[in-house]
């Protein structure tokens, strides 16, 4: 399947407004340029960029309000951060990324698509205070460590929206060894046995 056919398949499966699609196209076009000079997306993954990467990020929108302020940890190639920013133009997304080349791409995509978003270059654990009611991260860290990274927001009442793969239950069990939290596991629309974990009311077990 070509990238064009993959885009058509994504659009057939999701309700995307014309304005949002324009922003998404600008993001993906920018990624296409940058991937030629940076290791952002592998060549074997590109033909499924829409159904695999955009689609996997798109399903998080079911749990993120239109006006949400959100922080995305370890944003990399912009999934889900750029996709959420493209779809939630009334909110704001702050993406935290430590690699300079990736930050340069993220800023270029934000400018090209005119997104309500910003990039903080640095390690997540050294990030300054950032307003956020929601926290996302995709393929960033196992859940126990992810909760450590996200704790500055989660412990103040933010909601975690984390896509997880087939071993999510093992990660959940491990995370409960040092964190108390309420959660909901929603089956992923990306196929397989992955889920979207919605995590609230987070507190360290020894607090």
Curated annotation (Swiss-Prot):
The gene is rsmG. It is found in: Cytoplasm. GO terms for molecular function: rRNA (guanine-N7-)-methyltransferase activity. It comes from Hyphomonas neptunium (strain ATCC 15444). Its EC number is 2.1.1.170. Keywords: Cytoplasm, Methyltransferase, rRNA processing, S-adenosyl-L-methionine, Transferase. Specifically methylates the N7 position of guanine in position 527 of 16S rRNA. It catalyses: guanosine(527) in 16S rRNA + S-adenosyl-L-methionine = N(7)-methylguanosine(527) in 16S rRNA + S-adenosyl-L-homocysteine. Its main location: cytoplasm. The keyword Ion transport does not apply. InterPro entries: rRNA_ssu_MeTfrase_G, SAM-dependent_MTases_sf. PANTHER family: S-ADENOSYL-L-METHIONINE-DEPENDENT METHYLTRANSFERASES SUPERFAMILY PROTEIN (PTHR31760:SF0). Belongs to the methyltransferase superfamily. RNA methyltransferase RsmG family. One of its GO terms (cellular component) is cytosol. The keyword Methyltransferase applies. S-adenosyl-L-methionine binds at residues 74, 79, 124-125, 138. This is Ribosomal RNA small subunit methyltransferase G. It is an enzyme of class 2 (transferase). It holds the Pfam family GidB.
């Amino acid at each position: 399947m070509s990238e064009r056919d993959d885009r058509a398949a994504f659009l057939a499966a999701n309700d995307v407004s014309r304005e949002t699609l324009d922003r998404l196209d600008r993001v993906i076009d920018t990624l296409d340029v940058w991937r030629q000079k940076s290791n952002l997306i592998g060549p074997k993954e590109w033909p499924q960029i829409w159904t695999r990467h955009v689609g996997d990020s798109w399903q998080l929108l079911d749990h993120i309000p239109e006006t949400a302020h959100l922080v995305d940890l370890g944003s990399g190639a912009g999934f889900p951060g750029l996709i959420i920013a493209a779809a939630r133009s009334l909110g704001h997304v702050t993406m935290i990324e430590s690699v300079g080349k990736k930050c340069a791409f993220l800023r270029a995509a934000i400018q090209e698509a005119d997104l309500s978003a910003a990039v903080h270059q640095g390690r997540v654990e050294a990030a300054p205070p950032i307003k956020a009611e929601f926290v996302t991260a995709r393929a960033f860290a196992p859940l126990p460590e992810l909760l450590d990274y996200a704790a500055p927001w989660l412990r103040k009442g933010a909601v975690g929206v984390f896509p997880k793969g087939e071993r999510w239950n093992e990660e959940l069990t491990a995370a409960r060894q040092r964190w108390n939290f309420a959660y909901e596991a929603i089956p992923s629309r990306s196929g397989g046995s992955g889920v979207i974990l919605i995590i609230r009311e987070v507190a360290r077990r020894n607090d």
